[in-house]
Structure formats: C-alpha cells, structure tokens
Amino acid sequence: CVLIEVGLARGLDPQDALETLFEAGLEQGWVSDGLIAQSLGQRQEFWSVREHIPEANRLVGSVSSHDISVPISLVPEFITRAGEVIAELGPMLVNCFGHLGDGNLHYNVFPETGKTRSDYLDVRDLVKGGVHDLVDELGGSLSAEHGIGRLKTADLEKYGDPAKLAAMRAIKAALDPIG
C-alpha cells in the first residue's frame, strides 16, 4: 500500500495528475489497485490509517523493528530482497512503511497469525542481522530518523564507517568530556 499526496502549481488538476500516475503504475505492473480521495474527509481518513500504523505495530508486538534508509532508487530492491531474507528464516509477516520520497523505511517483522513474538526468540538476531546486512550492502543507514540510541550502538560499531565513528567520538568527547 502506498499513500501519495501531491501538491501542484496553481491551475493544475491533482485528480488528473494522480490518475495519470496511477495509469502509468498499472502499465508498469507496479500498481494493482488504488483509490483517490474524493473529499477532504476521505483524505483525512486515508492519512489516519497511515498515522495509526505505529500504534497498531506496538499492539501486535514485532519480532524485529527497523528504522532504516536506502537510496531511493533501491527501495524496491530492498523491499523484495528483505522479504526473501525473512522468508528464508521462517513464516513471518512484514509491515514496511515510511517516507519513500527520501528512502526512509520502517521495516517491521511480525509473528505469523496465531503466534507471538516470544515464538521467534531464536530468530530475532538473524532477522535483524539479515536486514542490516542488506541495508549495508545497498549503501543505506541503520538509523533513518530516530537516531542510534543505546540499542543500536553495537550495530553502529559493526556497520559504521571507521572514520565517521572516530569523528563522532571526537565530537562527543569535546561536548561531553565527563561522558
């Protein structure tokens, strides 16, 4: 599912622009179905669904959640290949959403229906490693918009550029000499 909102120059019809975009997507095989909001209320309903995804994800409980980015041109490849990585590890569900215009993705892996995240403790690290290895291979980042924090410091050490890490440490030491 992709949610697209357009802003156009005065005098251009957003309905026509979206229909043209949709038709091109159908012809390329990128789109199989779609809706165009017919009112402000319907537009708000579409956005409400998108805005409630993080809350729904928390209620389900993920096997592994990722805030990653990849070059925009490689988003389709990432989604396809990451799905293959997950499928090799067992039956799981993927919820990928984000900001396609800048390559930032929330790539979340969930238990299959009828199971819980505790059923996947033995593969959580494999899921995380598989996703992070692919992000690294594609020249992306393990942290798109939510920062590294304490949970991702080991990942930063593993996948980070040594020169950038040294610069980060120097800045940290200069700003926080006590630690």
Map each language-model feature to its residues.
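Noncatalytic alpha-helical scaffold of FAD-dependent oxidoreductases
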Residues: 1-179
